[in-house]
Each structure stands twice: as C-alpha cells, then as structure tokens.
Design a protein with these regions (language model features):
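Charged, gly/pro-rich active-site loop segments
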Residues: 98
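Localized edge beta-strand/strand-to-loop motifs within extracellular or lumenal beta-rich domains
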Residues: 110-112
Length: 174
C-alpha cells in the first residue's frame, strides 16, 4: 500500500528541521476526538496552541474552518467524515499569544443536544470540525501548514447512569 502526503498532514518519514521551523503549532494536530454527552445543551472543548521561539513578542493566529483539510483527510485515510455545519459550533476568529507567552488556549463550543436532535446520535458522531491557524502577519513567523491544522471529531455518547450497590450494608454508629 502506497501512501502520499499533502501539506495538511505530517509525513512521518520526512524530517522537518528544528522546532524553530515549526513555530507556532497546535498541541495536538490531525484528528482529535471530542467526547460529548448527547443530552448536554453545549460542550466546551479547549484547544491549546504552543510556540517555542519568538516569545519576546505578541503573535495573533487567525482561526479558519477549512473544508479542504477534511476532504484531504478523507481521501488519505479513506474515511467518510462530514463537515460539521456552522450552527452546531462556535469558535473565535483568532487566538493571541501575549508577549513572553509560550502557549495560549481557545475554546470551541459544540451544541451537542441541538446536533443530536437534528441528525441523531450515530450520524452526529460522523462530523468533524477542521480548523486551520494562519498567522495574522507573516513577518518573522514560520508557520508549518501541517502543525497548524487540527480536526475536531465529534464523538457523541449516550448518557449512562451507573448504580453501585455495596456488598455489605454499612454500619451506622450513633
């Protein structure tokens, strides 16, 4: 089986140089499962962005939903994931690194209950939100394409209640 890689994914057989060449980057890139309970109205998922070099200045990264990333992922891994429609999530338009800050976070809000009511539990777990980070300025920033992509996979679960009955009745002292 021969596999080809495009700019959206890291080719494990290729050397990418120093960490300086891959700055900034998502803490976890490629496909990340975001596990949610189907009856919750919404679920907030925190995404971490890191950098090793250039922390002496501020940096802003624009966040875009990039359907091409999902199309390429599906072709590469022969999967059938669908793009999560915009009414089922909120993401900020950008994320900023403060001066002398090596990492920052942003929150993606998923509207779990609304999604499950619209498409059902099984179908809801077939959606992915592909996010690409793009530097607001190119000046002094080396942003590797593969490190600035994250695909958030909706992993929807049914609510479960577990009752544990003790083996022996407890002793009450008064």
């Amino acid at each position: 089986c021969e596999v080809s890689y495009n700019d959206d994914f890291i080719d494990p057989s290729k050397t990418y140089g120093t960490a300086r060449d891959m700055d900034p980057k998502f803490e976890s890139n490629n496909l990340v499962d975001v596990t949610q309970i189907s009856i919750y109205q919404s679920y907030e998922h925190s995404v971490t962005y890191k950098r090793t070099y250039g922390i002496s200045r501020e940096l802003e990264m624009n966040l875009n939903v990039d359907e091409k990333v999902l199309t390429n992922y599906n072709a590469l891994f022969e999967s059938q994931y669908k793009l999560l429609p915009a009414e089922y999530y909120d993401i900020p338009s950008s994320v900023a690194f403060g001066e002398k800050t090596a990492s920052t976070k942003f929150v993606v809000t998923f509207y779990s209950e609304k999604l499950v009511k619209a498409v059902g539990l099984e179908e809801a777990s077939n959606y992915v939100l592909p996010i690409r980070g793009i530097p607001a300025t190119d000046e002094g920033v080396v942003a590797d394409s593969a490190s600035n992509v994250v695909l958030l996979h909706v992993q929807m679960l049914r609510p479960v209640v577990t009752v544990q009955i003790p083996n022996a009745p407890g002793k009450l002292d008064f």
